[in-house]
Design a protein with these regions (language model features):
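An anion/pyrophosphate-binding glycine-rich loop and adjacent beta-alpha core
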Residues: 264-410, 486
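Core beta-strand elements of the Rossmann-like FAD/NAD(P) dinucleotide-binding domain
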Residues: 40-43, 218-230, 449
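Long, amphipathic alpha-helical stalk/connector segments used for oligomerization, subunit docking
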Residues: 492-573
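Glycine-rich FAD pyrophosphate-binding loop
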Residues: 63-84
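Glycine-rich loop(s) and the adjacent beta-strand/alpha-helix scaffold that form part
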Residues: 230-284, 470-486
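N-terminal Rossmann-like FAD-binding beta1-loop-alpha1 element of flavoenzymes
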Residues: 43-70
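Conserved redox-cofactor binding core of oxidoreductases
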Residues: 22, 130-221, 234, 277-289, ...
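Extreme N-terminal leader/targeting segments of oxidoreductases
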Residues: 1-44, 165, 686-697
């Protein structure tokens, strides 16, 4: 692919084999739940999910003497292992040149508002340790000749704190962490889907799951029970929530699971959307060099005619080309960037083409077509920041594909691995849902509102309205480590719980009553309705009336599911049916939070423009004002708090809470603060100690 990088290196960075799992463990016991005989496993701590964050938590618990197991729907098959971009980013404090300022980094992490200041500082100061430990495990982060980590600029990053192993950074992270987890003897229960958290006395006692291989005449639904003292939710984000999604197929996350257990969720209004290839083929983010080489973006109508549609939006070819380039490091849609002919006008234009029934393509064998009345495309006619970047990269080649081959041959090689040759044919793409910034509410140790339950990774709502690219991978590592430290200090996980699992039989009976193969709502109907509603009403353009209508429809669907149940289509689909029931709850939760925010006067920020005929902001195009997307601006006061949602019975309640503060002027003092570390006072263990009967021996 390139004379600069040998093929064997390209292969190693794109084809990343994962470790083989050991043989499944036999259950510790079998218990009778009604008329079902259910296998029972006991562990001190259970991690749900096998992505980078969950594996980090499992490794850190194991290193501290914990008896930990992992339960996963598909080992090495989630977002961490199967997603990426041109050079997938890990965002950490800069360890080269003059180093970094953790407080400045924390400020950058929460610059978009609605993020806790203490969390931002934790992610900043913990990032160096997280990166170093990954390097110790074998993650091949690039260095200069003197040992400094190579850096570049990414989304919402004015300093240049990004680094990368190439398009498969997170998969490589999963690989080294999985190898370590297996080396430490961590059991992995594969093809095991958690469907209900068990609670007794206000504390977690276990998890009910389903596993197809456990199906039998005495256990027709394949139930599996895990008894545990601590539970870590690390199943990622709700990728199936949207029709237009760049998540790998089958990523459900655990928001619905958390709602059913009464956990508090936070910042559900905050997501991330951006351009990428659809998951019907090979889902991948088209950020970085894919757009920095400035390919020709066009649409095709039903008759096959091509449309240079971006020329309707930008005033000159130079302006158009420069903003296509800027999508490389301004990749997520941002409402404010629709103004003044900036880069998110590209996203808006793509969405509007889709609404016309047109398909949108990126052609790497053609430079951008000119804007009418403007000069043709030329590398000599670009905005200064764009020209400087391409000059520094040595990207003076005539065609986008040659510039891409020079700047990042891995970007070409990756698609070729999935039978897509972008050097030979145009690439179809769209604006897709990519990340949930909100999630399960956690404190500074990753604890949720239910004692004994923790959340890490995309499952945890630690991000604000915006975030730097790659900061989510860092947050998962930092909080995975902190959760491991906290569980280790508590002693919860040293010994598995003994005795009966309270409430298991009642939960099994409740779920059996919900499963109605003959009369329930078909799984496909739930999927189609939820995904269409979320993509059409809760994407980058939100019309208040449409959001309210969507919420009413979501409530009606959940009421129908409560009354009629859900119908698995075939044997082995019980887990998927229950996940879609939970996804319907998650959809209602997101729409409830969004409707509350909008009804309270909330404005546009981050991923969503709140369209309003009386809005202060009016995007302009070359052809005139875009009145249909006039939008409200964000109120400064909304940056200072977050919306917390909880399900009580069948109703969802929302309340605002202020962002947690952090005293940037405070200073630790060794002699004063060392005793808190030595005694474990830093872990605040008194607030969630298990009942005496559950204390490890």
């Amino acid at each position: 692919v390139s004379d600069r990088i040998p093929q064997r290196i390209l292969d190693a960075l794109t084809d990343v084999p994962m470790p083989r799992l050991p043989e499944p463990l036999a259950p510790d016991d079998t218990i009778l739940c009604g008329d079902q005989r259910v296998p029972l496993y006991r562990c001190g701590a259970l991690v749900i999910g096998s992505g980078a964050a969950g594996l980090r938590a499992a490794v850190e618990i194991r290193r501290r003497g914990g008896d930990v197991a992992i339960a996963t729907q598909s080992a090495w098959g989630g977002t961490s292992a199967c997603s990426g971009s041109d050079k997938q980013t890990l965002h950490t404090a800069n360890t080269a040149d003059a180093g970094d300022d953790y407080r400045a980094m924390a400020q950058a992490l929460r610059a978009g508002g609605a993020m806790d200041a203490d969390t931002a500082y934790i992610e900043a100061v913990g990032s160096v340790r997280a990166m170093a430990s990954l390097q110790y495990l074998g993650l091949p982060l690039p260095q200069d000749r003197l040992g400094g980590t190579l850096r570049y600029q990414t989304d919402h990053d004015e300093t240049g704190r990004a680094t990368s192993c190439g398009p498969r950074t997170s998969r490589l992270m999963v690989k080294v962490l999985a190898e370590e987890a297996l080396h430490l003897g961590t059991p992995v229960h594969n093809h095991t889907t958690a469907v209900r958290i068990l609670v007794d006395g206000g504390r977690v006692t276990g998890v009910l799951a389903v596993r197809p291989r456990s199906e039998s005449a005495e256990n027709p639904h394949g139930f599996v029970l895990f008894a545990c003292n601590a539970l870590v939710l690390a199943a990622g984000g709700p990728g199936e929530l949207y029709r237009d999604s760049v998540f790998p197929n089958g990523c459900f996350g655990s928001l619905g699971l958390a709602l059913e257990a009464g956990l508090e969720l936070v910042n559900l209004t905050e997501s991330q959307f951006g351009i990428g290839t659809r998951r019907e083929g090979f889902p991948w983010n088209l950020s970085g060099t894919y757009v920095q080489v400035i390919p020709y973006i066009y649409s095709r109508d039903a008759e096959g005619a091509e449309h240079n549609f971006l020329a309707d939006y930008y005033r000159s070819t130079q302006e158009l080309a420069s903003n296509v380039f800027r999508k490389g490091y301004q990749w997520p849609f941002h409402a404010e960037r629709m103004l003044d002919f900036r880069s998110s006008l590209v996203d808006l234009a793509i969405v509007r083409e889709g609404q016309k029934g047109r398909r949108v393509f990126m052609d790497f064998n053609r430079n951008p077509a000119p804007v009418p009345g403007s000069a043709p495309f030329s590398l000599d006619r670009l905005d200064p920041d764009v020209a400087a970047y391409l000059r520094a990269a040595g990207a003076s080649q005539a065609l986008p594909i040659d510039r891409l081959r020079h700047m990042n041959p891995l970007a070409i090689e990756l698609y070729r691995r999935y039978k897509v040759d972008i050097a030979a044919e145009p690439l179809e793409f769209a604006v897709n849902n990519q990340h949930m910034n909100g999630g399960i509410a956690v404190d500074t140790w990753g604890r949720t509102s239910l004692p004994g339950v923790y959340a890490v990774g995309e499952a945890a709502g630690t991000h604000g309205a915006t975030r730097p690219g790659g900061s989510a991978l860092n947050a998962g590592q930092v909080f995975g480590t902190r959760v491991g430290e906290h569980i280790g200090a508590s002693g919860f996980a040293r010994t598995p719980p003994a005795g009966a699992v309270a409430g298991a039989a009642a939960v099994v009976a409740e779920i059996c009553a919900l499963l109605r193969p003959e009369t329930g709502v078909p799984v496909q109907d739930i999927r189609t309705e939820v995904q269409a509603r979320m993509s059409d009403a809760a994407g980058i353009l939100c019309v208040p009336e449409d959001v309210s209508t969507a919420l009413s429809e979501a409530r009606a669907l959940n009421a129908r599911l409560c009354q009629s149940g859900v119908a698995p289509r075939r044997k082995g689909e019980v887990g998927r049916a229950l996940q879609w029931r939970q996804m319907a709850l998650a959809s209602e939760a997101v729409l409830t939070a969004l409707d509350t925010y909008i009804a309270g006067g909330g404005g546009s920020r981050g991923a969503r423009a709140i369209c309003d005929p009386a809005g202060e902001a009016l995007p302009q195009a070359r052809t005139g004002p875009l009145a249909d997307v006039r939008f409200r601006k964000e109120r400064a006061a909304d940056k200072t708090h977050q919306l917390v949602l909880r399900m009580e019975g069948e109703a969802m309640t929302v309340k605002a809470r202020p962002n947690r503060a952090f005293d940037a002027d405070s200073r630790a003092f060794f002699e004063r603060d060392w005793p808190d570390w030595l005694t474990g006072a830093v872990f605040d263990l008194e607030s969630d100690a298990p009942a005496a009967a559950d204390q490890p021996g």
